[in-house]
From Swiss-Prot:
One of its GO terms (biological process) is carbohydrate catabolic process. Catalyzes the NAD-dependent reversible oxidation of erythritol and L-threitol. Involved in the degradation pathways of erythritol and L-threitol, that allow M.smegmatis to grow on these compounds as the sole carbon source. This is Erythritol/L-threitol dehydrogenase. Its cofactor is Zn(2+). Keywords: Carbohydrate metabolism, Metal-binding, NAD, Oxidoreductase, Zinc.
Amino acid sequence: MSNQVPEKMQAVVCHGPHDYRLEEVAVPQRKPGEALIRVEAVGICASDLKCYHGAAKFWGDENRPAWAETMVIPGHEFVGRVVELDDEAAQRWGIAVGDRVVSEQIVPCWECLFCKRGQYHMCQPHDLYGFKRRTPGAMASYMVYPAEALVHKVSPDIPAQHAAFAEPLSCSLHAVERAQITFEDTVVVAGCGPIGLGMIAGAKAKSPMRVIALDMAPDKLKLAEKCGADLTINIAEQDAEKIIKDLTGGYGADVYIEGTGHTSAVPQGLNLLRKLGRYVEYGVFGSDVTVDWSIISDDKELDVLGAHLGPYCWPAAIKMIESGALPMDEICTHQFPLTEFQKGLDLVASGKESVKVSLIPA
């Protein structure tokens, strides 16, 4: 390694649920075809929080094995500067030392059924940064982009926390793509957190009849308007189902995109949709959800679609951020040094004062 790169660095290390520690670890060594990156910013995602709190999706239960691994550095939404790379990596990704770059959150194997079909976001091994030992994340001063990674350049002229928002925004845009929105649609987005705000912006870009945002926080509903919502509904104070059905001649919404991960948002969406409507689920749930499946089948014949990660949406997400189309200063509300990672996790968990919380490694 060059003289500019230290031998040791600070990093957050996952030892298991409720046991994340700030430690001094060795700076990772890149292999041929890889790039060493100095991390500039890493966002704290709801998935990070649910992993921290021990959700079965990550740590398993009687119905599924554990997916997350211990002794891993968390962090899958990030941006950094290229510190070291070889000619192979430079030519593959079109990058050079000093460039600001992001990497898509999954590092595909490129050998499985899904990768060979171009569905790399569903790669069978499913190595996401920050959850697997093969792919350590960005809650550290340095990280490595493996040779199999998907890498994109980002403008050096925007704040680092804005650039790191490309990851959640790509996810939002993929969920919008799954909805197959048309010009006459009434689109409802549940949740005005980081994912929901991106969904609102993406849905608005599809030029539907109207985009409606649901949340319980007045400040977030105001932010939703700045992201493109034509109507906002505070579900703690207003009857969303009645309002939406009154707007649509009694039919209901054409599209419902769920981005909260709250169990109550699922039956809410099923009830808000018209017959033959489209439900897109992006939320990551901390517990099981029970619904009346007859609404999906016999009552309404709904299309229920999942959405995962942000395949093929990263260039659009980066362009949207760089263009100033989103109120990024109001979305990226809090930044903390790496030493205060626990404060960041706790702030995200409170769900009240923040929208997007980021860590800024020294």
